[in-house]
């Protein structure tokens, strides 16, 4: 809805900010609450 959100890590680490541009998928880029994903954490500009 907003184009951004946060991912919760399984290892208990801090939540990770994610922007829709970082989603690697075709078509409409969206995630749903509770959806399992894999990701690499990168430091970006704020």
Swiss-Prot record:
Q: State whether keyword Transmembrane applies.
A: no
Tell me the ranges covered by the CSD domain, including all copies.
1-46
Report the GO terms under cellular component.
Answer: cytosol
Q: Which UniProt keywords apply?
A: Activator, Cytoplasm, DNA-binding, Stress response, Transcription, Transcription regulation
- Cite the Pfam families for this sequence: CSD (PF00313)
Q: Which CDD domains does this one have?
A: CSP_CDS
Q: Could you tell me the superkingdom of the organism this chain comes from? A: Bacteria
- Gene3D superfamilies attached here? Nucleic acid-binding proteins (2.40.50.140)
Locations listed in the record: Cytoplasm
- Subunit comment for this entry? Homodimer.
Task: Quote the protein name from its UniProt record.
Answer: Major cold shock protein
| Species name | Photobacterium leiognathi subsp. mandapamensis (Photobacterium mandapamensis)
**What taxonomic lineage is listed for the species of origin?**
Bacteria, Pseudomonadati, Pseudomonadota, Gammaproteobacteria, Vibrionales
Q: Which gene encodes it?
A: cspA
């Amino acid at each position: 809805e907003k184009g951004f959100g946060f991912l919760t890590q399984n290892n208990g680490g801090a939540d990770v900010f994610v922007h829709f541009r970082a989603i690697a998928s075709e078509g409409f880029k969206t995630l749903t609450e509770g959806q399992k994903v894999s990701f690499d954490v990168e430091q970006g500009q704020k």
